[in-house]
Structure formats: C-alpha cells, structure tokens
C-alpha cells in the first residue's frame, strides 16, 4: 500500500507538528516503485533548528508506523524548512520574511524591495532608488505573486531599520563566505540558508 496523498499526510501530521510549535507549510510525496519519499516542510516565527527537525521526524515516523493505512510500506521521511525562496502566500509568511528582499508581482508592475511591517491587510516595502530609500504600502490583496530573493550581501542598517528589523530567531542576510569548505568541494554558504534550510540528514528509512 503506498503512502497516503499529500492532503492526507497534512491531515495526519498537522496537530502533531503544531504541538511542537511549528506550522506545516507543505508536504511532497513521491513514489518510486514500492518505495515512497515524504518531505515535510515546517516553519515557525523563529525558524527551525536541527534538533527540532529531528524530533519532528521521529514523532512523525512513529505515527506513520502506527497507522494501518501505511503499515509496512517502505518510505523515507525528511523534515526541513520551506527554504527562503518559497512563495509568500499567507500573512505569517510575510511576517516571518520581514527584513528580506522580495520580488513582488502586482497588476501591471513588479516591485523589488525589502519586506517591512505587516499591517491588517497590507505590508510596508522598503524600496531603494536614486533618491534614497522610500517606504511603500502594498495591499496584500493586490499581490499576484511574491518570492523572497537570495542575497549575497548584507543590507544597510538604515534599510533594515526602515523595514522594522529581522524577526527574533531569524538571520540577517550576509555576505557569501567560505567558497571552499574543508573537503575542498566548492560551496557558497549563506547564514540564512544555514539557519532556515535545515534538513534532517539522518531521516527515517522504513
């Protein structure tokens, strides 16, 4: 019997994940023959750390093992953060992305700016230009698509101050460093990616 659908997995795990202080942002279920892979993306206002990802993975694995609808189905389970480039579709996404640069598609124009304070039905966006920094209020209902951008340099203190700062527990976008790690393999490290793109490397294979 294959692992249940994405919708069913979300239904099964949401209460468990919420009890740990996290939200289920998405679930991806893929199958290859008799084996399935389940990738669960979770987040909170303070992001997610390795220990928390491992604990959620353990709890979900125990839950799956106890369900008749999954039974002895072989599967691999991974718990991770959604990553910084996921679309901003809910108010909590905007709140957690405060201080990050985003590409915001509106009707007839695209705005690139730093996400600021979230209000009842709008968000402040700090926009840089030849005349300096300005703050524009954008109605959430006017946003067609918004995606946080990967950054390789730190924003100015003035820009961050106008945006309202970075939420507690989140990292400030930083310079790309350590282009070569100790193993000699080329890599680019971003402090935000290190904090937010947390994966349970051990996973659970069943």
UniProtKB/Swiss-Prot annotation:
Q: Which UniProt keywords apply?
A: Cytoplasm, Ribosome biogenesis
Where does it primarily localize?
Answer: cytoplasm
* Cell compartments where the protein resides: Cytoplasm
Q: Provide the coiled-coil residue spans.
A: none
Known role: Required for maturation of 30S ribosomal subunits.
Query: What family name appears in the similarity comment?
Result: Belongs to the RimP family.
Q: Which PANTHER family match?
A: RIBOSOME MATURATION FACTOR RIMP (PTHR33867:SF1)
Protein name according to UniProt: Ribosome maturation factor RimP
Q: Which organism does this sequence originate in?
A: Rhodococcus erythropolis (strain PR4 / NBRC 100887)
